[in-house]
From Swiss-Prot:
Keyword rRNA-binding among UniProt keywords: no
Subcellular location: Cytoplasm
Identification of the protein by name: Exodeoxyribonuclease 7 large subunit
Membrane spanning stretches: none
Record family assignment: Belongs to the XseA family.
Organism: Mycobacterium tuberculosis (strain ATCC 25618 / H37Rv)
GO BP terms, alphabetized: DNA catabolic process
Length: 415
């Protein structure tokens, strides 16, 4: 093999031939997918189709003979899920890859349901069905986002019923394909667009009934994960009551039909008015009952003697007040007399113990007379010893009825 480098590059034909050789060595493969496009010209023997993987949004070009398409076990059309067997091939002229089919099989209903069940278990294990993740539906949505088929009965049912129940209801309608190969992509795009709109408070995903194949887009993994990622509450109204696509398990609220969805996202004006009227009647009745109870209570209070004649309480207690006053006066008189007598006794004892009584019995109090001199005067002192009154000391002698002046002649012998 020639060494390949920037200085020695391969020509396009060499690369194409090598790639075609590698791919040609591959054996036949079985592939499952959804038919997204079928090109079958009347005069052509080869049919060109596109096989799509909805979960990964990838596609593959396939070719087969016209007879193989006409003899297929199901009518091939866009959106049909099939299993094909083909040999990979690379066309060097256009540099394209495709599968040359040798067999086409339809995916049975049982197989579809089994795959949906496997996906259901996977999403459930990841917590996408957890009731704690369900967002509450607003009581009065400012605007209702509606994703449905163009001019469909589902769109008519939702808008008509919701407007009849709440005339002020507003809608942001996104018409999309609700079956076929383009359904999932368009629904997811519309869902994300409405989720980004700040005016949209709730999103309704509506579609009428159909076969299992028709409802396959609503059990698609991509759509289920897109619903779980929404910040806006999502309501599903897909099919009829028995239908149960996987999106019903992910949404915040499931409605049995589009009409049921309209009833669940907006209140009924008439019912709300009846409720308000009933509340007003009950409030008025409660107020009347309260006023009646209070009036009876006031009447009972007014009928009591104490309120009929307020002086009754004073009259009943007047005699007690008079007795209390008499008792208080008597007790005060006795208390004053007892205290007066006690004070008299104390005064007599004080008089007996005082100096005046002693003087009256013939005793005298002798004091030295205050002396003045150059160094200051001396205070008069009670004479307690003969030594305190030497000769010449001036004395003051106090007796019971007055005082006398005297002069000490000094100490004398004897008493």
């Amino acid at each position: 093999m020639t060494q390949n480098s920037a200085e020695n590059p391969f020509p396009v034909r060499a690369v194409a031939i090598r790639v075609a050789g590698w791919i040609d060595k591959l054996g036949a493969v079985w592939v499952e997918g959804q038919l997204a496009q079928i090109t079958m010209r009347p005069d052509a023997k080869t049919v060109f189709m596109v096989l799509r993987d909805p979960a990964a949004d990838m596609s593959l070009t396939v070719t087969c003979s016209r007879d193989l398409v006409l003899s297929a076990p199901v009518k091939l059309a866009e959106g049909v899920q099939v299993v094909v067997c083909g040999k990979p091939s690379f066309y060097t002229g256009r540099g394209t890859f495709s599968l040359r089919l040798s067999e086409i099989r339809a995916v049975g209903i049982g197989e579809l349901l089994a795959r949906i069940d496997r996906l259901r278990r996977l999403l459930d294990a990841e917590g996408l069905f957890d009731p704690r993740l369900k967002r509450p539906i607003p009581y009065l949505p400012n605007m209702i986002g509606l994703i449905t088929g163009r001019a469909s009965a589902a769109e008519r049912d939702v808008t008509t019923v919701a407007s009849a129940r709440w005339p002020a209801a507003r809608f942001a309608v996104r018409n999309v394909a609700v079956q076929g190969p383009n359904a999932v992509g368009q629904i997811v795009e519309a869902l994300r667009e409405l989720d980004r709109d700040p005016d949209v408070d709730v999103i309704v995903l509506a579609r009428g009934g159909g076969s299992v194949e028709d409802l396959l887009p609503f059990s698609d993994e991509t759509l289920c994960r897109a619903i779980a990622a929404c910040r806006t509450p999502v309501v599903s109204a897909v099919g009829h009551e028995p239908d149960n696509p996987l999106c019903d398990l992910v949404v915040d609220l499931r409605a049995a039909t589009p009409t049921d969805a309209a009833k669940k996202v907006v209140p009924d004006t008439a019912a709300e008015q009846r409720l308000i009227d009933d509340l007003r009647r009950r409030s008025a009745q409660a107020l009347r009952n309260w006023v009646s109870r209070e009036q009876r209570a006031v009447a009972q209070l007014r009928s009591r003697p104490v309120l009929a004649d307020p002086m009754t309480m004073v009259s009943v207690r007047a005699e007690e007040v008079h007795r209390a006053r008499s008792t208080l006066r008597r007790n005060l008189t006795l208390m004053v007399a007892a205290e007066t007598e006690r004070i008299g006794h104390l005064a007599a004892r004080l008089a007996t113990l005082g100096p005046a009584a002693t003087l009256a019995r013939g005793y005298a109090i002798v004091q030295t007379v205050a002396q003045t001199g150059p160094e200051g005067g001396s205070e008069p002192q009670v004479l307690r010893s003969v030594h305190d009154a030497p000769e010449g000391t001036k004395l003051r002698v106090r007796v019971a009825d007055g005082a006398l002046a005297a002069v000490s002649e000094g100490q004398t012998n004897g008493l």
